[in-house]
Amino acid sequence: MMYFIYLLSVMLVLSFMAFASNPSPIYGGLSLVLSGGVGCGIIVSLGGSFLGLIVFLVYLGGMLVVFGYTAAMATEEYPETWVDYTVVLNLAIMVGMLGVVWYEFFEEVDLGVGYDLLDLGGMEVLGGDFNGVSLLYACGGWELVFSGWILFLTIFVVLEVTRGEH
């Protein structure tokens, strides 16, 4: 399980680096959605299954609005991809800087695999976050409805703004 969490952590860092070196806003939105999914996967792996699901749904709704806006406002006929020379060079520079920072802070290159970082007990898939479900629906249910309604209206605002005068 720790190897899986380590793999998800590496994927999270790589997705953030993909966002930082995005050649086109479309790929930037895609990498943000992927990083949100990987981050919620880490939360689920650590036992927060309901929290990971709620965060993923709210984050995915917000990112769909942002992704729709960037796709509508910045459409290019031939967008740059991640295999272009400048993008690969920027990504290589970021990987090198990350390696230097890692070496300076930790004095050696140690991946940390095999250490017991968390006391997960029996390694349950379903964690203790189900205790907060009743509290979420009792006190925070209207906040979820309100947030969903705002995201729903934002989609229509983005579509109206990007419709243009055709």
Swiss-Prot record:
EC identifiers of the protein: 7.1.1.2
Signal peptide extent: none
Membrane topology (UniProt): Multi-pass membrane protein
Pfam families: Oxidored_q3
GO molecular function, one term: NADH dehydrogenase (ubiquinone) activity
GO biological process: mitochondrial electron transport, NADH to ubiquinone; mitochondrial respiratory chain complex I assembly
Compartmental location: Mitochondrion inner membrane
Keyword Cell membrane attached: no
Transmembrane segments: 1-21, 26-46, 47-67, 86-106, 139-159
Reactions catalysed according to its record: a ubiquinone + NADH + 5 H(+)(in) = a ubiquinol + NAD(+) + 4 H(+)(out)
GO cellular component terms attached to this protein's record: mitochondrial inner membrane
Keywords from the named record: Electron transport, Membrane, Mitochondrion, Mitochondrion inner membrane, NAD, Respiratory chain, Translocase, Transmembrane, Transmembrane helix, Transport, Ubiquinone
Similarity comment: family membership: Belongs to the complex I subunit 6 family.
Biological function: Core subunit of the mitochondrial membrane respiratory chain NADH dehydrogenase (Complex I) which catalyzes electron transfer from NADH through the respiratory chain, using ubiquinone as an electron acceptor. Essential for the catalytic activity and assembly of complex I.
Assembly behavior: Core subunit of respiratory chain NADH dehydrogenase (Complex I) which is composed of 45 different subunits.
Protein name in the entry: NADH-ubiquinone oxidoreductase chain 6
Organism of this sequence: Tachyglossus aculeatus aculeatus
